[in-house]
């Protein structure tokens, strides 16, 4: 829908595919202010494995004395716009050199859905192998999300992972020759050659565990249709809070270490887009009553033509923190140290204190550069016009932020930190302090729950759970100095604990409602508002799924 104020023909919409011009849609007099549907052919020669469609609006509303920032210059592209593609699937060779493609494609922004196939209800070691693989794929999927449907002796209609041993294998692998070592092989789906299966093969379940660790730690060496894992050796143990996705808390961190893509700390334009930096912090970082967090910020920017109100605004989690002026001349009274550098950019250095109490597990630091751009004026007979130029802003890679002066403390149980950060299990990124308790003969739903939980933790830490422990014997957890993750029923060794029994039964049967309820999650009610007002008891015929946190009876911490 084009603005009714546009000049016909002179105003147009340019369509690019991968920065190649595909066509121009001129705005005609009949289209002004009306919804328009137009078709534009796309040249398939310019389509690659990663594509970007860009729309560029060229708008004019006056022949002379035009204000390029006028609010009458607009064109709306509807959400119902779409690409209509006709394509033919091609058979892909069984080559692991591109692994994890096709099972996971980093260019696909959709949630990862990767089925896992077992010959039947898996034993504990086979579940541990699958959990490691799920956590590794979860670490790759990250913010996209992940789902691992479970199949017993069935074939899905999409790429999948298969676990098999010489003695126990799905029926569709009954003719596969036995293996002599932990083996990872890519094969065609017997029902569809365009679908691939990644078969994790072994002589027994211990081989499957070794192969799973090989995927998590040695996949960069994969090539050919199959590989064997000869051995894995730990050279250096992991340390607490060293998850790759978390900001380091043992020293100051440069902004270069926080970048997730090149050019992230740069922006250009008449009004440059905001520069954002993600800060994923351990949820138990103790910031209460702290004065703040030190950030040494270095930035460069195009000099404003005159001294005006151009500024840089700093926000944390969409909450405004502080503003700094963008100066056009030397001024020793300002907080910014300006040094002339290349192409008319100014160099600034400021120290900022971030209010610590606003920090959570996942934070976004945003820098908005607001320029006051002079606009043309005059009359039709005496018009003043000029061509606006782009402004360039850069946050220095050597800017630093320091979280090393704080302790680690948190009151548990707290299911929020489990949902948002996989904590406390993610304290050790490889889950070496975690013991998972699973049923002896799990159902598909219970295995899927295990894989979903481990995949979620992997997405938070950025590392596979290669050192987690797992058992199907509830008696083995007694006096264990570990974080326990229970899948399915509560082990009999814990059923004698009255606190746990009361907690589980309460979750099933009754709920308390507070005096005052707030719909906004950002509002944390005080003690008076959280005081229970009513208690309701319910008996239901349907099953219920729940996540429950409680203190281990075997450890006070």
Feature locations, PLM:
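Solvent-exposed alpha-helical segments and adjacent loops
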Residues: 1-557
